[in-house]
Amino acid sequence: NFTVRGRVIDAYGEPLIGATIREKGGANGTVTDVEGNFFLSVPDSAVLQISFVGYESQEVSVKGRSMLEICLKENILLLDHVIVTALGLEKKESSLAYAVQKVRGEELNRVKEVNMITALAGKAAGVQVSKNSSGMGGSAKVSIRGVRSVAGDNQPLYVIDGVPMLNSTSEQAYSAIGGTANAGNRDGGDGISNLNPEDVESISILKGAPAAALYGSQAANGVILITTKKGNTVGRRDIHFSTGLTFEKAFSLPEMQNSYGVSDVTDSWGEKENLTVYDNLGDFFRTGLTSITSVSVNSGNDKLQTYFSYANTTGRGILNENKLSKHNINLRETAVLFNSRLKLDGNVNVMKQTVKNKPVSGGFYMNPLVGLYRFPRGEGLSYYKENYERYDEDRKLNTQNWHTFTEDFEQNPYWIQNRIQSKDARIRLLLSLSANLKVTDWLTLQARGNLDYSADKLRQKFYASTATALCGMNGRYIEMDYQETQMYGDVMAMVKKQLN
């Protein structure tokens, strides 16, 4: 063997980045670099097969040459985009009767997001994506072609590699655990946020009624198809490492008046005064920070492909004590047997996540914004920040310290942050296996099975003197455990035959 060096270009002399070069009849192969260059060790009698998406493949005999320049011609027929459609089947975009948009995985990962689906914002026409106001670990709201229901669910159906995903949002009302409707809701997160965005190859968004026909009423709001990565077939091992930091700040704060002082209970404001201006709102929020680090190993050949990835996510929200830690492990094996007639594909995806002190959305009792907005203008909050509790001689314990005793309406926001503590833990397991058998040149059979299991635990502590309407005089301790399991399977026969 000797090393042959080459360069792959197009008709205009521009380098083709990522073109595949393989030794004919063997597993030896490589891809071109950013300059279109490649190096490959082959026998002097080897024949190289060069291919690139949208171009005609070419075979070149080495014949002992150490330097090659290969020019590929465009193939207009191959330039038609291939789209993953319903049930994970691939078709040319021009053959579809409904609207489809495709977003590549590289576009999703330009900005690191804890919830991968929020990275879709601004990348697909007609798709509206917004983060929930519940801080780290919260769910995302996605609507395709506008909101269809005012009170109902507008979320699309998520399908991973052809299998529908369990994407329930575990929003918990405090009224369900003995409180009242004024306590607000806790967002327990959604299923799609459990995925590692680095594992995503592409996302296809299906719009219109025909796109959702195969999935029934659960896809009434559209379908988001996620195709995950596999091992490569060029006989090399690629290791990819990435890390990113994201900073967050409160986007918009209300403008507060600074001309009128404190009123009595019956008036909205008091006398006009020359007030000292304090930035109590700005001081309450901090700069959020999210760190996402991932590593993946991609290897394989014509017969066996392997993809492995690990990702670690840590973050702190814009509210103090709101923290997140998440670990993702993914292993995918693909085997091609019996002269490419049988293809087996297996995937194991495990996620472990812990979120501390999720803030609530809405309500009075557990919402720190109520106390912040109603705090007297012209007074600073620093005293109540440092002294959010005081010792009660009668009860012989520390109780909440606040400028008013109307705890049925508002509480010290720093007491809420430090003395209402919660911990949400989730473990999620996704198992999938598929077999594809080419029976004849025109008949292919496919069988798939999937298991989606999640286990959630909530631990929450309300210290004594927290709003008695919710917690009583002595506080409250809550434990909640719940599990969800979804099993899915299908068998398909695909016929591809020319009818005269």
Over which residues does each language-model region extend?
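Alpha-helical support elements that line or immediately flank enzyme active sites
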Residues: 182, 431-437, 451-453
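Short, small/polar-rich motifs associated with maturation and membrane association
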Residues: 1-345, 349-351, 430
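Short, Lys/Arg-rich amphipathic segments at extreme N-termini
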Residues: 9-10, 414, 437
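Surface-exposed loop/interface segments of Gram-negative outer-membrane beta-barrel transport/assembly proteins
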Residues: 94, 152-155, 160, 166, ...
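Long hydrophobic segments that form regular secondary structure
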Residues: 297, 436-441
